[in-house]
């Protein structure tokens, strides 16, 4: 996959993007043939035990990005710039974006709208592709006052559209639309020449992204309306561990076939 191929998919073929935070997951996604692997700062919620993406550091992102690249050597990987790794300084923002590219990303994702255009253009000038992200932006959780759908009021719709157009003009190759009304997502998708990728943004985006853990049911108690659980992996893994525990306790594991004998194989 390349940026050029992603751009050509608009209005032709739906783009599939899924998160990964480690090598085994990345291997599964590459085998499945997803179009884009996202190393999201959502690793904070899904892997590191944080209650939001805000505590995630650049160093943590790099460690997980490296693991994903090792697991999916041939995939197109986008990595998030985490909170406080960009925005306060153009130079630091571009440097940190470059570190993600150096460590295995094909592109970086930056949350926010027109306010990031100077950073985006500086990144593009030195060869760093950028994916935009508007709507509900998790790093701004405290500003939103919680996980709230965006774009319900006319003023909010206008702001979303203005930011989408500004990002396209800045040179991003695609935009994630998160937790916005289906109507504004449809309008944005129709007015942009670059692909939109939705998460909780309805049926009319050019692609869809979901968190791996939500797809496979690793946290079955978390059931956001916009997501879908395709398997209950939590129960499968729990049953496996319980069986192992039981066999150790009743001394049926290890069995003869699991041990080494003198003169044997």
UniProtKB/Swiss-Prot annotation:
Cofactor(s) needed, names only, are: Mg(2+)
The record's keywords, sorted A to Z, are:
Cytoplasm, Magnesium, Metal-binding, Pantothenate biosynthesis, Transferase
**Entry keyword annotation includes Nuclease:** no
Locate the active site. 178
Q: Pfam families in the record, alphabetically?
A: Pantoate_transf (PF02548)
User: InterPro entries per the record?
Assistant: Pantoate_hydroxy_MeTrfase, Pyrv/PenolPyrv_kinase-like_dom, Pyrv_kinase-like_dom_sf
Q: How is the cofactor bound?
A: Binds 1 Mg(2+) ion per subunit.
> What pathway annotation does it carry?
Cofactor biosynthesis; (R)-pantothenate biosynthesis; (R)-pantoate from 3-methyl-2-oxobutanoate: step 1/2
Stored CDD domains: KPHMT-like
Annotated Mg(2+) binding sites? 41, 80, 111
Q: According to its record, what are the GO cellular component terms?
A: cytoplasm
GO terms in the biological process aspect are:
pantothenate biosynthetic process
Provide the residue positions that the database annotates as binding 3-methyl-2-oxobutanoate. 41-42, 80, 109
Recorded GO molecular functions are: 3-methyl-2-oxobutanoate hydroxymethyltransferase activity; magnesium ion binding
Protein EC: 2.1.2.11
Q: Where in the cell is it found?
A: Cytoplasm
Q: Which transformation does this protein catalyse, written as a reaction?
A: 3-methyl-2-oxobutanoate + (6R)-5,10-methylene-5,6,7,8-tetrahydrofolate + H2O = 2-dehydropantoate + (6S)-5,6,7,8-tetrahydrofolate
Q: Record's family?
A: Belongs to the PanB family.
Instruction: Sum up the protein's function in the record's words.
Output: Catalyzes the reversible reaction in which hydroxymethyl group from 5,10-methylenetetrahydrofolate is transferred onto alpha-ketoisovalerate to form ketopantoate.
Task: Quote the NCBIfam families the UniProt record gives.
Answer: panB, PRK00311.1
Q: How does it assemble?
A: Homodecamer; pentamer of dimers.
Q: What is this protein called?
A: 3-methyl-2-oxobutanoate hydroxymethyltransferase
Q: Which organism is it from?
A: Thermosipho africanus (strain TCF52B)
The organism's lineage is: Bacteria, Thermotogati, Thermotogota, Thermotogae, Thermotogales
Q: Gene for this protein? A: panB
